[in-house]
Amino acid sequence: MAPVLENRRARHDYEILETYEAGIALKGTEVKSLRAGKVDFTGSFARFEDGELYLENLYIAPYEKGSYANVDPRRKRKLLLHKHELRRLLGKVEQKGLTLVPLKIYFNERGYAKVLLGLARGKKAYEKRREDKKEAVRRALEEL
């Protein structure tokens, strides 16, 4: 279960409350680009639309040998979850200030692409600064 790509920025910008594993519906050339690690999480998020969950603004680079089979790199991609998980998530996301952000994309042991979603609350700037200071102190103590 080695991660293809991890969204480290999300853990800095958001407080992660819960995590969920979801399948992701991809086209063939997207899988090839994903295996090559050509993914950018910047600005990506998950959103409900007509009772289904979609991952939006995730950039998967076009496969260089893909020709006409390549699709829009920032297209909406459907996330695959059980109905009871979708209902539970919908209730939580409707709360003010909570959002779903992708934390990690990887391939499971069966070779299927999975995305680890985090139910998150945005951090304020002063919270980020406080956390950065704590991390700097921890590193300084480790060096000694």
From Swiss-Prot:
UniProt key word Phosphoprotein: no
GO BP: trans-translation
Keywords: Cytoplasm, RNA-binding, rRNA-binding
Gene Ontology CC entries for this record: cytosol
Disulfide bonds: none
SUPFAM superfamilies in alphabetical order: Small protein B (SmpB) (SSF74982)
Keyword flag Acyltransferase: no
GO molecular function per UniProt: rRNA binding
Gene3D superfamilies named among the record's database cross-references: 2.40.280.10
Localisation: Cytoplasm
Described purpose of this protein according to its UniProt entry: Required for rescue of stalled ribosomes mediated by trans-translation. Binds to tmRNA (also known as SsrA and 10Sa), required for stable association of tmRNA with ribosomes, probably by bridging tmRNA to 50S subunit. tmRNA and SmpB together mimic tRNA shape, replacing the anticodon stem-loop with SmpB. tmRNA is encoded by the ssrA gene; the 2 termini fold to resemble tRNA(Ala) and it encodes a 'tag peptide', a short internal open reading frame. During trans-translation Ala-aminoacylated tmRNA acts like a tRNA, entering the A-site of stalled ribosomes, displacing the stalled mRNA.
Miscellaneous information on this protein: Athough the Valle et al., electron microscopy paper indicates this protein came from T.thermophilus, its sequence maps to A.aeolicus. The Fu et al., paper maps the coordinates of T.thermophilus to E.coli.
Family to which the UniProt record says this protein belongs: Belongs to the SmpB family.
Protein name (database record): SsrA-binding protein
Protein source organism: Thermus thermophilus (strain ATCC 27634 / DSM 579 / HB8)
